[in-house]
């Protein structure tokens, strides 16, 4: 268990019990006790097996402290939603109405433009870092330029309705993803990375380290976007790009798109200097536990320029979703987060 600088209390173990004690969170684990002031905790993340008292649950809800329950691979399972959840009914009403006008199309376009821009930035970053290998550096640079051209075309493309927009935007996103991951594979050869695989786990004899790390961090990213979607009273199940399915948080998957390349760079940095042997079946759980911890301590505190200010990722995500809501309510188009190269 640990508490990050921003206030994430990460419970990543077994046999842990959490209770409320006079404005503090009492943590009992393996005969040891630890108390943390509740006011210093902004989110409790339960990844291991833990028991929480009903009094603590009530206190978390009343104080507005977020509670996330996730699997070992970071996939969000549940969140605590207080009766006094944030946002207004109008936010959700405007979200529903936006599927019938240009607002839905522009949000769908904006999040994928933001994603492609950040993918191009990553390729430019790795091209610069590999200048000693002129051929590889040139290939990465050319691919980045190709993504930028695709991005500009998407910016200017016209769509008659949201259904046509969804189909054509996702087709372009898929094309750009193929270009991007082919070049990423060329710089991750030592890890035997061949491309994206969305389904990986911690079981079995053959573990794909890169895809496993990406999927864990994408899952944790989705949980953070989900948190902010709920804060503003939006419907997480109604998206603009991802097809609706029962239980699928489609809007969350839409809005996390610009952040995915940021997660990519974080994961590749995490793997730098590590050995693939750390992902052998008998010790991989410990390696992934370290990654989960680093996601909250490092990635969520990563500072980037956003709308003229240098802000932490936690704050950027909040302001980004607030921008989406403002646009739905008649404001200017939202600013997409950007990672410089």
UniProtKB/Swiss-Prot annotation:
Superkingdom of the source?
Answer: Archaea
Say yes or no: keyword Metal-binding present: yes
Q: Name one GO molecular function term.
A: DNA binding
Tell me which InterPro entries the record gives.
Cas1, CRISPR-assoc_Cas1, CRISPR-assoc_Cas1_C, CRISPR-assoc_Cas1_N
- Per the UniProt entry, the Enzyme Commission number(s) are 3.1.-.-
> What's any GO biological process attached to this entry?
maintenance of CRISPR repeat elements
Keywords, sorted A to Z = Antiviral defense, DNA-binding, Endonuclease, Hydrolase, Magnesium, Manganese, Metal-binding, Nuclease
Q: What class of enzyme is it?
A: hydrolase
Q: Which cysteines are joined by disulfide bonds?
A: none
Task: Report the cofactors.
Answer: Mg(2+); Mn(2+)
Name the positions where Mn(2+) binds: 173, 242, 257
A Pfam family the protein falls into: Cas_Cas1
Assembly, in brief, is: Homodimer, forms a heterotetramer with a Cas2 homodimer.
Q: Which PANTHER family match?
A: CRISPR-ASSOCIATED ENDONUCLEASE CAS1 1 (PTHR34353:SF2)
Its biological function? CRISPR (clustered regularly interspaced short palindromic repeat), is an adaptive immune system that provides protection against mobile genetic elements (viruses, transposable elements and conjugative plasmids). CRISPR clusters contain spacers, sequences complementary to antecedent mobile elements, and target invading nucleic acids. CRISPR clusters are transcribed and processed into CRISPR RNA (crRNA). Acts as a dsDNA endonuclease. Involved in the integration of spacer DNA into the CRISPR cassette.
Task: Return the similarity comment.
Answer: Belongs to the CRISPR-associated endonuclease Cas1 family.
Q: What is this protein called?
A: CRISPR-associated endonuclease Cas1
UniProt lineage: Archaea, Thermoproteota, Candidatus Korarchaeia, Candidatus Korarchaeales, Candidatus Korarchaeaceae
